[in-house]
Amino acid sequence: GWEVIAEATFSEFGERGSIDVLARHEATGHVAVNEVKASIGDAGATVMGVDRKARLAPVMAGKLGWRCLGVSRFLVVGEGATSRRRVAAHAETFRTAFALAGPECRSWIRQPTSRPISGLFFLSPARTEDGNRDSRRPASVRPQRPRTG
């Protein structure tokens, strides 16, 4: 299985920041950099940020005592029409940076192969057992208007 660290911080070579989810698959020596975005803003900045973190991942892995034989990169985007439109508007940029899509990414995560990959997939909000959205997410509440007589 995978061992994960959420918000893995780094300060290397004058660069500071954090990786949303840094993971390792001990059996294969793979390290995965997972950038999680609720939505996509600047496509170029997003890709450059993931590239920078992937470049620093072997150093971070070494400091954690992890063996690193390869780094895979994933961009995980919140499901939604706006996110899909923004990815589609910059399809060539995202396809070049993240060659694989959702099903292929999930398959690799379940059973990593010998080669590192890069992929983009959309993730829907968590659902509870009754099928509703996760209640831990803050709900929008509208104040009631005063009634007039």
Q: PLM features: residue spans?
A:
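A short acidic/basic microdomain associated with nuclease active sites
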Residues: G1-F13
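Short, conserved, surface-exposed binding loops centered on an aromatic residue
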Residues: F13, A23-E26, G65-W66
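Short, flexible loop/turn motifs enriched in small residues
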Residues: G14-S18
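Histidine- and/or cysteine-centered catalytic micro-motif in compact active-site loops
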Residues: T9, V36-S39, G78
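Short, structured loop/turn "capping" segments at alpha-beta junctions
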Residues: E3-V4, G29-A32, A61-C68
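Short, charged, amphipathic alpha-helix that recurs within catalytic cores of restriction-modification
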Residues: T46-L64, R73, A89-H90
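Conserved catalytic cores of phosphodiester-cleaving nucleases, focusing on short active-site segments
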Residues: I19-D42, M48-A57
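Domain-level recognition of nuclease-like catalytic cores that cleave nucleotide substrates
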Residues: L69-R147
